[in-house]
Amino acid sequence: MDHLKHLQQLQNIERIVLSGIVLANHKIEEIHSVLEPSDFYYPPHGLFFEIALKLHEVNCPIDENFIRQKMPKDKQISEDDLVAIFAASPIDNIEAYVEEIKNASIKRKLFTLANTIREQALESAQKSSDILNAVEREVYALLNGSTIEGFRGIKEVLESTMNLITENQRKGSLKVTGIPTGFVQLDNYTSGFNQGSLVILGARPSMGKTSLMMNMVLSALNDDRGVAVFSLEMSAEQLALRALSDLTSINMHDLESARLDDDQWENLAKCFDHLSQKKLFFYDKSYVRMDQIRLQLRKLKSQHKELGIAFIDYLQLMSGNKATKERHEQIAEISRELKTLARELEIPIIALVQLNRSLENRDDKRPILSDIKDSGGIEQDADIVLFLYRGYIYQMRAEDNKIDKLKKEGKVEEAQELHLKVNEERRIHKQNGSIEEAEIIVAKNRNGATGTVYTRFNAPFTRYEDMPVDSHLEEGQETKFEMPTT
């Protein structure tokens, strides 16, 4: 009896809200930001709200005359229901009634979901991981006031497309439609990191891909976006240290050893306060599965609507949900699910990847798409694939190889002299930030051109910087040191 009384009260609340729309048509936009027609318990009320929305779309008055005209022939609202709606007494505090309708709708959907979970759990053929993933998606949809929709009509899609074109026109000559990468020339290729896209950033070890990632993180923060960083290799504190070094222009060595003068301490304090105000979130557990990343991002997005981008360092350290699969199959599954998650949350996801060692055997060590380790479906799933290449790293390795060769030939003194010289040059290079060129190679770009972006890497501050177009150094001149002969 109590339940029946509650339903009668709910119907009355729905009538009052609909009557309020008839009295004040402009309120429908605010109400629609919370409610959908499916949120109404009593079906005729949901149909009434749907008709009212269609009238509002074409700037028609929402009144008794137009409601009756627009009523579909196959779905009629009874005369008694119409009279009850138009006769209901609207109230001033309609927001509370709207929330009550939404609250009741969510409870009904939760009840339905609970029954579905029970039925699926009793089916022995259903895998628990599949059930959990489905539950996560449904709960996330409820938290965001939406449902998992089916087909979208061409009219709706075209309207959305035109809104996007109009928004880009409003931005004028700006070429960045997504989140700025932090590099003007890279933005010219990509138009920034756009929502729903999966971006792969690949490099060999020691190339500095984590530093490049942190540069991109800071760029997104400057665009007032919320940023999530999954760091499976470095602690959050280590990444924060790099960010502070970049922002303060205090080299990492001095920052770690706290050898700072008064001005540097003051600068550090200012940057600390500035960065503390940003929406930057770290998840730095060394072991993480794909389903955990999905759960954490959904939770973070529901708590912080301004979340605009996520970074993962790096993909091959993640674990698949099904341990029985071959590793390349797990990686392919992870990349596919990351792409799906990016579209679901409507954010770009940037995943760092390790490249195959085999590229070291080539004369030209610039990466190509086939160098992606355990590539599987990564290349296929990615909207953009970026590679990082620093010739200076290979120059150092060539110097080390020459020293080893001299030792094997018995030229110990010559090897020691070269070793001392090389170490001193590297120390000066690291401390003083000698000019070093770095290439960001756009190897795949689903919606644009491919090519190479030239930047400078400022080693002491782990900072990548824009380089003017066509001003990059010639091969073998990226530093003041010459490539050693063999």
Curated annotation (Swiss-Prot):
Pfam family for this entry, one: DnaB_C
Gene Ontology cellular component annotations, sorted alphabetically: cytosol; primosome complex
E.C. no: 5.6.2.3
CDD domains cross-referenced by the UniProt entry: DnaB_C
Residue intervals of the SF4 helicase domain: 172-471
Positions of ATP binding: 203-210
Catalytic activity entry: Couples ATP hydrolysis with the unwinding of duplex DNA at the replication fork by translocating in the 5'-3' direction. This creates two antiparallel DNA single strands (ssDNA). The leading ssDNA polymer is the template for DNA polymerase III holoenzyme which synthesizes a continuous strand; ATP + H2O = ADP + phosphate + H(+)
GO biological process: one example: DNA replication, synthesis of primer
Gene Ontology molecular-function annotations: ATP binding; ATP hydrolysis activity; DNA binding; DNA helicase activity
Disulphides: none
EC top class named in words: isomerase
SUPFAM superfamilies noted in UniProt: N-terminal domain of DnaB helicase (SSF48024), P-loop containing nucleoside triphosphate hydrolases (SSF52540)
Transmembrane segments: none
Hydrolase is among the record's keywords: yes
UniProt keywords, alphabetically: ATP-binding, DNA replication, DNA-binding, Helicase, Hydrolase, Isomerase, Nucleotide-binding, Primosome
Family from the record: Belongs to the helicase family. DnaB subfamily.
Quaternary data: Dodecamer.
Function summary: The main replicative DNA helicase, it participates in initiation and elongation during chromosome replication. Travels ahead of the DNA replisome, separating dsDNA into templates for DNA synthesis. A processive ATP-dependent 5'-3' DNA helicase it has DNA-dependent ATPase activity.
Protein name according to UniProt: Replicative DNA helicase DnaB
